[in-house]
Design a protein with these regions (language model features):
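N-terminal basic, amphipathic alpha-helical segments
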Residues: 1-131, 137, 331, 335-342, ...
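Active-site PLP attachment segment
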Residues: 71, 296-329, 341-344
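Conserved core of the PLP fold type I
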Residues: 129, 134-269, 281-282, 287-298, ...
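Short glycine-rich anion-binding loops that position phosphate/pyrophosphate groups of nucleotides
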Residues: 115, 244-248, 309, 441
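Helix-loop "lid/cap" segments that line or gate small-molecule binding pockets
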Residues: 155, 319, 347-355
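Hydrophobic beta-strand scaffold residues
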Residues: 217, 273, 422-423
Length: 468
């Protein structure tokens, strides 16, 4: 199958491929259920790196345009395709009904942790983009190497203020989203394979990325205080991947004692710690643990961050903070993957950060999402009494460890989705948990959803008791 893309060499290839594939899906030229060509075939057809195609497919999968069926391949999603009009870095009109962003799926699709698209500061962002185009003039287009110098300074300043991280702009490597960050880390730390230690449970895209890098994967179980240091393996390891602020997916917050223990283990094993701060912008007060990178002194930790939780998928830029000793190697690796950053978007984001508008936007989000989280917790307590939850200190989803009398987690998650909630099942041999998202629903919508779920489970429980 030949793919009808028209690529030019003076624009970022990854961006072009994403936009053109999305357009083919929007227009119906790639029909629902159609099998996509392999990444190797596409890379060969256009003479590009297979990593570039993998990143494009990953982005299309993340946004619901494509879906992967194990042992069969990658296919155009069966979900309804929304109107065209959104490209990377250019927001479409945020829908007023709180529906999913472009390429979003249909009923029953969860995608936990989605931000509310109606909260995106659309007018402000469009003004920033227009101003950036005017200022850049004929230089607008792409920026090379580690990205726009101004944005790297802006991110370093923002991290110092918001996360207490003292880093040099030279340590900031700009990437086109979290997935490219994961691929860059894989190339940087796993050039010849090696042992990669991951959390259990773990985001499947992380495991897939490191497996593709040739890593020998080892999983370490997570409990309510995060990954368990005593279960970390003896002997050498290449990397340890953790999500300490809001474990993905369980929501667990890594305790201060365990943070110190992880760094001690990393020193003994020779591993680099990859700290994914994917939900770091949305925190709800209380005692805040210091980022691993600040505790480490900057030698054994790489810190991944992005703006997607606060700004949604329309602003794709992210970053990796690397130890200063690795900065040159990281820049070289970035050039091999994709030696460009969209100049207009990076200039707009730098202005957003420097003006204080981004900080005000994040503060507003904290208040709105905090009320939604409280509404969800209040509804759970009202119907189910004292509840055990993880992940209430950050992010846009929490884990409810529900009573076994409510049945299987998978069944309860399906019931919750039918009640209008954003839900997924998780858990293991020792626990049952339901992951509940609260980013895209109003307070009233969350309360109504839990009311309906409680009524449904009450009827089921009563029927089961009568049957006995």
């Amino acid at each position: 199958m030949l793919v009808p893309l028209k690529l030019v060499r003076d624009q970022p290839l990854q961006r072009q491929m994403f936009e053109q594939f999305a357009s083919l899906i929007h227009s119906g030229r790639l029909t629902a259920g159609a099998r996509m060509p392999s990444t190797r075939m596409v890379a060969g057809q256009f003479g590009v790196s297979r990593i570039t195609v993998l990143l494009v497919y990953d982005r299309l999968i993340a946004e619901g345009c494509l879906e992967t069926i194990p042992a069969k391949g990658t296919f155009v999603s069966q979900a309804p395709v929304p109107r065209p009009g959104t490209a990377m870095g250019r927001p479409a009109q945020a829908p007023s009904d709180g529906s999913a962003p472009p390429c979003g799926g249909g009923i029953g699709e969860t995608r936990l942790g989605r931000p509310d698209p109606t909260l995106f500061p659309l007018a402000r962002w469009r003004a920033l983009l227009r101003n950036s185009v005017v200022r850049l003039g004929t230089t607008a287009g792409t920026d090379h190497g580690t990205g726009a110098v101004r944005l790297r300074h802006s991110i370093a300043g923002w991290l110092a203020t918001s996360r207490g991280l003292a880093v040099s702009p030279d340590q900031v490597i700009l990437v086109s989203g979290r997935q490219q960050a994961l691929h860059l880390v894989s190339h940087l730390l796993l050039p010849r394979g090696g042992r990669a230690v991951l959390e259990d449970p773990c985001d499947p895209s992380v495991a897939r990325t490191y497996a593709e890098g040739g890593a020998d994967l080892l999983y370490v179980r997570v409990d309510e205080r995060g990954i368990r240091p005593e279960a970390l393996p003896d002997g050498p390891a290449a990397l340890l991947y953790v999500t300490p602020e809001h474990q993905r997916p369980s929501g667990a917050l890594l305790s201060a004692e365990r943070r110190a223990a992880l760094l001690d283990w990393a020193g003994r094993s020779g591993a680099m710690v990859v700290e994914d701060d994917y939900d770091g912008e949305i925190r709800y007060g209380g005692i805040e643990a210091a980022p691993l990178m600040s505790l480490d002194g900057g030698e054994r930790v790489l810190h991944i961050g992005c703006f997607a939780t606060a700004l949604g998928p329309w602003v794709t830029l992210g970053y990796i903070i690397v130890p200063i000793s690795m900065a040159q190697a990281a820049r070289n690796c970035k050039r091999l993957l994709d030696d460009s950053v969209e100049a207009v978007e990076s200039a707009a984001l730098a202005e957003f950060l420097e003006s204080g508008a981004y900080a005000r936007h994040v503060h507003r989000l904290h208040k709105i999402y905090s009320r939604r989280r409280d509404a969800l917790l209040g509804a759970l307590r009202r119907h189910f009494g004292p509840v055990t939850t993880w992940g209430t200190s950050a992010g846009l989803h929490l884990a409810w460890h529900f009573p076994k009398t409510l049945g299987a987690a998978v069944t309860l998650a399906e019931q919750a989705r039918h009640c209008g909630l954003e839900a997924e099942a998780t858990g293991g041999a020792d626990a049952q948990a339901l992951l509940l998202g609260f980013g895209t629903l109003s307070e009233a919508g969350l309360e109504c959803g839990i009311d309906r779920l409680a009524a449904h489970t009450s009827v089921q429980t009563g029927s089961a008791m009568r049957a006995v």
